[in-house]
Amino acid sequence: MGWIGKLLNGGDEKNKPAPVTAAAAPEATLQPATITEIDAMYYRWLAAAGSAQAPAETEQQILDELARLVREPIAGAALVPRIPAIIPQLMRTLQDENMSAAKLSAQLAQDVLLVAEVYREANRPCYQSRYNASPSINNMEGAIMLLGQNGMRMLLARVAFRPIVSMQSGGLTVRTAPLIWRQSEKCALAASLVAPTMHANAFDSYLAGLMANVGLVVAFRLIDQMHGPDVFPQSDAFIAQVFAQARILSVRIAELWEFPQSVTRAIGQVGVDANADADPQAQALALGERLSKLRMLADSGRFPADDPFVTTGLGKSELLAFGKLADDDE
C-alpha cells in the first residue's frame, strides 16, 4: 500500500488505535423483596405445602368464608380464645406512671399462671448481670421492679395472646398456630425496637405486632376445615387475598376487644408494601412484620441469615433489630 493509502487508512496496522468496545453494563441493583413475595414464602413454609394445588373453586370458597367472617367479626372472634378478664385490669394499672408494685402484685396474685410467668421472665439470663451471680428472684414485688413498667406491659400482652396457640383443631392448625405465635412475638419485638426512629409509640407498636396475626390464625382454621386431603390452596393470588382479608379481620377483632385506636389503625393501614406516608405506627408494624417473617424463614433454614433476599434494603439499625429476633436459650 502506498503512502497515500497508509495515510487514508491511518498508517500501519500496529499504529491503529484499539477498537472502541462498548462499556461494560453496570451490574443490576438488587431490589428488596416485596412483602407479597415474603408472605407467599412464609405461607407455604408455615403450611409445609407440597406441590399439589387445590382447585380454584376450593380457594374461592375459603376466601368467601373468610370474607363472611370479616363482615361478621363476632363469629370470627369466636374462633380464637378471649383475652383473660384480669388482663385489662392489669393493663389499666400499668398505664399509671405512678403505679405501685404492691398494688400490681396483689392483682397478679389472682392468677397463678400469671405469677409463674412473671417469675419465669424475671429469672431469664438476659435480666441477670454478666458480672453478678445474683440469686433467683423469689418475690413478686422484686420481679416487678426488675422488669419495669414497660417490661411488665409486654409480658402481660404476651400472656394475654398465648391461649391462641393452645386451640385444639385439625392438624394444620396444630402445626401453624405455634409458628404464627412465635412470629407474632418477633414482630412485636421488632416493631417496638424500630418505633422510636419512626416517632411511634413503642408499646402500641408491640401490641399491634401481637394482634396483627389473629386473623391469620382464623384463616388457617378455615383452610384446615375446607381444603382437600391431597391438595393445598396456595396460588399467589389466593395467598395475597388470605393475608389481606386476615388483616381486616384482625382489625375487626381488635375493635371488639377494645384495643386502642392507635393499634387498630396501624394494623389496618399496613398495606402490601410499607408506605412512607403511612402512620408512623403502621410503618413500625410493617417493618416488624418484614423482619419477623424473614427471621422465621432464615432460622428455619430457608435462607442463610445474610442472604441478599433477607438483607437487601435493610439499614444498619434494621439489621441490628433483625439480629435481636434470633431465638435465644431461655
What do the predicted segments below correspond to?
Residues 2-210, 217-225, 232-330:
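Conserved alpha-helical "signature site"
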